[in-house]
């Protein structure tokens, strides 16, 4: 039997997430709650763990306390078997400076690579919502002989200009890696589609080390994985694309096969939540064969009393809905909605309370927000604009701990 390759997982989780403000005012983007019982980082960690990649370093920097705590409490593996998921804050090993980019984060954390001495390194982002079996991508990387493999998702060519785009040949070799081009390239088999980078990479270890070292010595570099490292390897003919559409996840439905969302804006974050709530959801949280992990809390079940109801909604553990109406919404844990309140098309994060007769529509309420009796959010946007953040799509976002 062929020995399994030695793989180290590195998750880039230092992002500030300015476009998600106010949700990122007090936490790193990967720590933002999602889906009623998770945090954004749980999706990438679940994909790696489900694929049995069990040596994982999570590189953190910006306001990382809640992220570090979440990983430590909810992602404990067996140290006796050499398995670990460990948060690694920026440590200034190479001098008194923080990470200046994702490639610099790898450069300043090279000791992790030397200590583990892997054959291959999986470097994934921490802030996307999706299911993926990364082992299939690693196998293609090994078989192709590439030094680097970039996961690409197919999007309509007319929509690809907002992303980093991949130009590849019939063999999968990448000929060009172009950031937000005016005229995106088609895929080899369909000129109306474009491969867009998902921010997920596989590297042969020596190739990565050499590229990171060369980049560190380049004063003109922004020290970014997608902007500098991958183009460097493309120029050397060492990069290949992995078609995400070929990834087969156990238990996936026809509807959520190939689902991937960048939730970097308030509108995208909101829309991804709305993908969860229908009877046959666009993204199915309930796939037991490829579970999303990390959301376990020792809480009582949700409770509905005095005729309270929730339709086409996800309701987290410990929540209580009393004589209130919830529709097309996602409620996290320990949310309380009092008599006569109405919640429609909204995302409510842990510990929020919505008072008697209050109305919340088309809104995101962060943790521990209190909406007083009779108050309204998302009903009068002119009034809300004076108090809260409002997205381009009209989603009202209320920051953590605000009393209304």
From Swiss-Prot:
Pfam families: Hexapep_GlmU, NTP_transferase. GO terms for biological process: glycogen biosynthetic process. SUPFAM superfamilies: Nucleotide-diphospho-sugar transferases, Trimeric LpxA-like enzymes. Gene3D superfamilies: Hexapeptide repeat proteins, Spore Coat Polysaccharide Biosynthesis Protein SpsA, Chain A. PANTHER family: GLUCOSE-1-PHOSPHATE ADENYLYLTRANSFERASE, GLUCOSE-1-PHOSPHATE ADENYLYLTRANSFERASE-RELATED. Belongs to the bacterial/plant glucose-1-phosphate adenylyltransferase family. NCBIfam families: glgC, PRK00725.1, PRK00844.1. This is Glucose-1-phosphate adenylyltransferase. It comes from Mycolicibacterium vanbaalenii (strain DSM 7251 / JCM 13017 / BCRC 16820 / KCTC 9966 / NRRL B-24157 / PYR-1).
């Amino acid at each position: 039997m062929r020995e399994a390759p030695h793989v180290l997982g590195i998750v880039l989780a230092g992002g500030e997430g300015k476009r998600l403000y106010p949700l990122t005012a007090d936490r790193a983007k990967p720590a933002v709650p999602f889906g009623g019982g998770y945090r954004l980082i749980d999706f990438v960690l679940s994909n790696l763990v489900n694929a049995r990649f069990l040596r994982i370093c999570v590189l953190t920097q910006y306001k990382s306390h809640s992220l570090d705590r979440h990983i430590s409490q909810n992602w404990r593996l067996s140290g006796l078997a050499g398995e670990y998921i460990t948060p690694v804050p920026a440590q200034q090993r190479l001098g008194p400076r923080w990470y200046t980019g994702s490639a610099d984060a790898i450069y300043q954390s090279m000791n992790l690579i030397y200590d583990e001495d892997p054959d291959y390194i999986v470097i994934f982002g921490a802030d996307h919502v999706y299911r993926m079996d990364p082992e299939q991508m690693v196998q293609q990387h090994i078989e192709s002989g590439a030094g680097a493999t970039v996961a690409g998702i197919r999007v309509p060519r007319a929509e690809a200009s907002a992303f980093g785009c991949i130009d590849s040949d019939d063999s999968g070799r990448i000929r060009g890696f172009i950031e937000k081009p005016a005229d995106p390239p088609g895929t080899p088999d369909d000129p109306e589609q474009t491969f867009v980078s998902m921010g997920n990479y596989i590297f042969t270890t020596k190739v990565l080390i050499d590229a990171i070292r060369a980049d560190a010595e380049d004063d003109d570099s922004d020290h970014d994985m997608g902007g500098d490292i991958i183009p460097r390897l493309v120029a050397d003919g060492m990069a290949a694309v992995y078609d995400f559409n070929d990834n087969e996840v156990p238990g996936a439905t026809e509807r959520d096969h190939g689902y991937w969302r960048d939730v970097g804006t308030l509108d995208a974050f909101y829309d991804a939540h709305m993908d969860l709530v229908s009877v046959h959801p666009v993204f199915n949280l309930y796939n037991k064969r490829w579970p999303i992990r990390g959301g376990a809390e020792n809480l009582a079940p949700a409770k509905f009393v005095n005729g309270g109801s929730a339709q086409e909604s996800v309701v987290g553990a410990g929540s209580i809905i009393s004589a209130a109406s919830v529709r097309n919404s996602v409620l996290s844990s320990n949310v309380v909605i009092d008599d006569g309140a109405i919640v429609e098309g909204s995302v409510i994060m842990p510990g929020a309370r919505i008072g008697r007769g209050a109305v919340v529509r088309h809104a995101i309420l962060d943790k521990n927000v209190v909406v007083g009796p009779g108050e309204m959010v998302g009903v009068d946007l002119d009034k809300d604009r004076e108090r809260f953040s409002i997205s381009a799509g009209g989603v009202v976002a209320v920051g953590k701990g605000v009393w209304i």
